[in-house]
Regions:
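Extended alpha-helical scaffold segments
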Residues: 113-134, 160
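Acidic, contiguous internal or C-terminal segments within carbohydrate-active enzymes
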Residues: 127-136, 146-158
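Acidic, Ser/Thr/Gly/Pro-rich intrinsically disordered interaction regions
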Residues: 1-114, 140-154, 172-330
Length: 330
């Protein structure tokens, strides 16, 4: 008589257990030992019971474990321009790199970018709350109340650390495309690209914009983390003209220079720049290393706006039709 079938050998189904997310599943990808399920609103990590208990010693384990990773789904620009864009571009059919490793690093980079945005939002909320409180309070004597956004040094340090972690992951991805970059920095990448492709190459033009900010991130982090001179962070401060200045940061260290700037603006601008940089480097590095595909004239191009919501990305492999419209393939 045949042995009874183990419960884990049977088919089944499950629903995402998040009452705050009733949106449909839009994407699924297998990465490492996990399945990632992405709805319009959130991203989840799923693993099977055999991954938790491979020897099947506990028959009472539920067949599936699910965990919400982010409140970032296919409606999120952060996720679309990082993880979704990497999924479309970092493909074995088109590239000779370690695509699985590139995807793992992209996910790790997204974790840092999501945390960085939380720091941005937290600081912006603290700053605005302090401003609102000041505007709502009337002066009772001849003194002037100066608001506070909290420990601005700590906020800036946390932001710089998360930003630098993201930049480090991005450099690891770069080294999958350019093995000779191992142990080298952004200046080295820029010099290599100019020597190989020429100053006017679009990839070099992207690096001309990106590298100064990537170095600013590292230098700001070094100063704040190691208490080095070169970064000045100020909370709300009274000015000689009687006004109250908002929290600011200025940088002058190792060639990186930033004039006194509102901290909330600095954070939002750097966060946007990092997202732009990831997307553009992914596009240009993939284009530079694209392999021939079945004898067809494939290239990377902009996904038409009317189908971007279906693709969840702005760039893809494809071809131009006779009318000059880019047709994404894959």
């Amino acid at each position: 008589m045949a042995a009874p079938r183990h419960s884990r050998d049977s088919g089944g189904s499950f629903t995402l257990n998040n009452p705050d997310d009733g949106t449909p599943i839009k994407e699924m990808l297998s990465l490492g030992k996990y399945l990632y399920v992405i709805t319009e609103k959130c991203s989840y990590r799923v693993q099977m019971a055999d991954q938790v208990d491979p020897e099947r010693k506990n028959s009472a384990l539920p067949p599936v474990f699910q965990q919400k990773l982010f409140e970032l789904g296919t409606d999120s620009e952060l996720l679309r321009r990082t993880l979704m864009q990497a999924r479309v571009l970092f493909r074995k059919e088109f590239l000779g790199i370690n695509s699985d490793k590139a995807m793992e690093l992209t996910l790790e980079a997204l974790v840092e970018l999501a945390a960085l945005h939380e720091v941005c939002e937290t600081f912006a909320s603290s700053e605005q709350a302090a401003i609102d409180k000041l505007e709502a309070s009337a002066s009772k004597d001849k003194s002037q109340t100066v608001p506070s956004a909290g420990n601005v040094q700590t906020h800036c340090k946390a932001f710089a650390q998360k930003a630098d972690h993201f930049v480090a992951k991005l450099m690891e991805i770069v080294r999958l495309f350019y093995l000779e970059q191992k142990g080298k920095n952004w200046d080295d990448l820029q010099a290599m690209a100019k020597g190989r492709y020429g100053d006017s190459d679009p990839f070099c033009e992207v690096l001309n914009i990106a590298v100064p900010v990537l170095k600013l991130v590292r230098n700001t982090r070094d100063c704040l983390e190691h208490h080095l001179p070169g970064v000045v962070v100020r909370d709300f401060e009274p000015e000689p003209d009687g006004s109250i200045s908002v929290p600011t940061i200025e940088v002058n260290f190792r060639g990186s220079s930033l004039e006194r700037t509102r901290i909330s603006s600095f954070m939002s601008q750097v966060a946007k720049h990092l997202l732009d940089t990831f997307e553009m480097l992914a596009v240009h590095m993939s284009s530079k290393h694209m392999k021939p595909f079945a004898g067809m004239p494939m290239e990377i191009g902009p996904v038409p706006e009317d189908v971007q919501n279906a693709w969840h990305v702005r760039f893809a492999y494809g071809m131009y039709d006779q009318n000059g419209r880019f047709v994404p393939c894959g």
